[in-house]
């Protein structure tokens, strides 16, 4: 759903979109469970493997988390295709953690991933705008993103921005937990990328 109503004539589109994003960030910050963030980061830092999963638009968010977390040296697993994600989930163990991203938390395929991971003993971190969803109920920790109340921009648009910020928060928390090891791994990544620049 892109538009819920027609854009009012003369409305400041730039201001409206930015204000919606700012409101979503502010509301999420006020409601955020800081303990859940820290404990989620600890699980990720100690995991054998971290599976980063999401479908549709949520898959691009999962890929962003993958792009961030591999900088720390953590063993991360990511796939764009649902069947590939399901295959990864089938290999999960009790020593693994999965971060599943879903705006609604109600998709059949996303639930199938969560159930397979849970059946294999993996810890589940759920990032969603719907903390009462079937997916959220399967999670060990739920990181809630405040849904935007815009009448024009779909909720998931603003939720995406907040999700990216929450990944940044987790990334920094993980680096702090890893101390020197995390910094060393980050520097290795920076060095190898720098060699490819003119």
Write out the residue ranges for each language-model feature.
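HTH-adjacent hinge/linker in prokaryotic transcriptional regulators
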Residues: 1-35
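A ubiquitous structural signal for well-ordered alpha-helices
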Residues: 21-24, 28, 40-43, 65, ...
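Short secondary-structure junctions and interdomain/linker hinges
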Residues: 32-35, 51, 193-196
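Glycine-rich phosphate/diphosphate-binding loops that line cofactor/substrate pockets in enzymes
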Residues: 35-47
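Glycine-rich phosphate-binding loops that contact phosphosugars or nucleotide phosphates
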Residues: 45-165, 169-178
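A short, charged, Gly/Pro-tolerant segment at domain boundaries
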Residues: 180-198
